[in-house]
Design a protein with these regions (language model features):
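Conserved N-terminal alpha-helix of the aminotransferase class I/II PLP-enzyme fold
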Residues: 3-41, 233
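Active-site phosphate-binding strand-loop segment of PLP-dependent enzymes
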Residues: 82, 86-138
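Amphipathic alpha-helix from the class-I
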Residues: 207-227, 238-241
Length: 308
């Protein structure tokens, strides 16, 4: 009754309201940054930010397994994009040392990789960025509500103030809709005026923003949810070992590689018939012959849920 069901326009016209301001302030505090900016999706946050910050005179250095939204942002930016082998810091340094020191260089990485659940060595990336005068950008889509005490990869690696750009989503741990960017005030003010995916999109609904704000408050003020999540991760790790499945879990993403597309689909269908949703991930999302079942553990799962 107070805010209506829709936003009525883009953020720069009539779509902003006090709930946006409250959520963006809360996100900035949650990520230990000066300001934050909400986008309609995580995809739009990545595409809009990367394409706004770089052009054909600049360099982007990107992990080979980064999310499609990062890849598309690199393409739209027209920057010279150089790919380093997955989490390989020797390869990253070899690329950086051969680039002009004074040119704009942006190192971009997922923090938790969506298909394997492994964690980027953000501390080493930050060190190399400082050494070679590069900016750093981390996508915390799968780390917010997971790493550290729930605040994400920067907290996990104790890098507050040392990562230039933090991105995240409101649709995973926060169970709402949207994405966000957090960083210095000058960064956010620049994106407000330059990020086309922000400028030319109707704003999120008040219900989306209000639910995100409440969910963020729960994570920020109650560590028990993150503790329960890691209890569940440990429980699943034990179950996998008991069944001779050798996977070392560090996050809630559990990839069970079956190689064959058909086998992945068949297993997923049989599980679905037993009321278990386990996604069959196939090319082009993963490489050929790397089809898998991806289990996503949450704090809301009971041991009975997980012991299927």
């Amino acid at each position: 009754e107070k805010y209506g069901t829709g936003s009525g326009g883009s953020r720069l016209i009539s779509g902003s309201h006090i709930l946006f301001a409250k959520l963006e302030q809360a996100l900035a505090e949650f990520k230990s940054t000066e300001k934050a900016l909400v986008f309609n999706t995580g995809y739009m946050a990545n595409v809009g930010t990367i394409s706004a910050l770089t052009n054909n005179n600049d360099y982007i250095i990107s992990d080979e397994l980064n999310h499609a939204s990062i890849i598309d942002g690199c393409r739209l930016s027209k920057a010279k994009t150089l790919i380093y082998r997955h989490k390989n810091m020797t390869d990253l340094e070899n690329i950086l040392k051969n680039l002009p020191y004074s040119h704009t260089k942006l190192i971009v990485t997922d923090s938790v990789f969506s298909m394997d659940g492994d964690i980027a060595p953000l501390d080493e990336i930050a060190y190399l960025a400082h050494k070679y005068n590069a900016l750093t950008m981390v996508d915390d889509a799968h780390a917010t509500g997971v790493l550290g005490k729930g605040h994400g990869s920067v907290e996990h690696f104790h890098l507050q103030g040392k990562i230039d750009i933090q991105l995240g989503t409101l649709s995973k741990a926060l169970a709402s809709e949207g994405g966000f960017v957090a960083g210095k005030k000058i960064l956010i003010e620049y994106l407000i005026n330059k990020a086309r995916s922000y400028i030319f999109s109707t704003a999120l609904t008040p219900a989306d923003i209000a639910s995100s704000l409440e969910a963020l408050s729960l994570i920020a003020n109650d560590n028990s949810l993150v503790d329960k999540l890691y209890d569940n991760i440990s429980y699943v790790q034990d179950l996998l070992q008991q069944n001779n499945i050798d996977i070392n879990l560090t996050t809630p993403i559990v990839p069970i590689i079956v190689h064959s597309n058909e086998k992945a689909l068949q297993i997923a269908q049989k599980l679905y018939e037993k009321h278990i949703i386990l996604s069959a991930i196939r090319p082009p999302t993963v490489p050929q012959n790397q089809s898998r079942l991806r289990l996503a553990i949450s704090a809301s799962h009971t041991q009975e849920d997980l012991h299927f």
